[in-house]
Amino acid sequence: AGKPLTAKIYEIDQPDVLLWCVWAVQQYAKHAGREKCNRKYGKLLYDILHYIIDNRHPNLKLCENGLLYSEGKDKAVTWMNSTAGGRPVVPRTGYIVEFNALWYNALMFTAKLFANTDDTAFVQNLQMDARVCADNFAPMFYNEFGYLCDYCVDGYRNYDVRPNMIFAVALDYSPLDKKQCKSVLDYCTKELSTPKGLRSLSPKSRGYNPMYVGPQAQRDYAYHQGTAWPWLAGFYMEACLRVYRMSRLSYVDRLLVGYEEELFYHCIGTIPELFDGNPPFHGRGAISFAMNVSGIMRVVKLLDKYNNL
């Protein structure tokens, strides 16, 4: 853990990689317990949080409002990274919604992990940063329609209805209150949910293109403009259980049936990369996609946990 971060984490120059690294450690803590997690990864988390807080990342700036800012106008910096003519098809830039949801979650989780250690100053600083982040998250992203803007920059708020807002509800620690969480989740249910994943863009939004077909350039434009992604559905189902608890167990169970059926098509026993956003929801892209498989498997384990309560 004493090595530089660049020696430990692949693609550290991507703004969200460190945030997802903290999330991955958080999942390990659920399995192994906080004490063992702290012994194994505590120093790494300490280094990651300081790396971000000290503004040492080349494209992840912690602003005075407690929110993270990344420049993505000319180069794609999020998972929506398709390009056309050397430019991002979806130029998400500035305050990006899932970056800041992940940031709040990272602050809260790390503070809790270090709560019983001697580093009280570190914990107090994390808690203070989390409060500032939470105080400014909803005013920045939550709009008058009851969902989250996808990104905000220089006074502009992007109102495209995209699935990136689901992370603010699904993660263990949310900067939103209960009413806001329910509203965001319900928006995802109404406009983004399909039997094969969450759409990358609502059919009501400008530029909706649900069919991943045609030559490469045409597919690049459609890649994040309406296609459905199962790994996002994993977080959606987790959010359903977090907001509605036991009353959504049967609903989530029914959603999983669609993925069970998919195991007998394309590549037997696995799930393809993405699906068309409109019926009949044909599977497209790579015939097997690890993020989708792991996302659905995680929900299956989560269902087992709820069923055993």
Which residue stretches match the model-derived regions?
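Long alpha-helical scaffolds in large eukaryotic adaptor/regulatory proteins
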Residues: A32, T110, F114-A121, C240-V243, ...
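Amphipathic repeat-derived elements
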Residues: K8-H31, E35-N38, G146-L171, P215, ...
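Aromatic (Trp/Tyr) and acidic
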Residues: L5-K8, S82-T93, N100, R157-T194, ...
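Catalytic cores of carbohydrate-active enzymes
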Residues: H50-I53, H57-N65, Y69, L102-Y212, ...
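Acidic/His metal-coordination segments adjacent to aromatic residues that form catalytic metal sites
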Residues: A1-I12, G72-Y95, D154, Y212-A222, ...
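Aromatic-rich carbohydrate-recognition surfaces in CAZymes
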Residues: A1-E71, V97-N100, Y104, T227-M246, ...
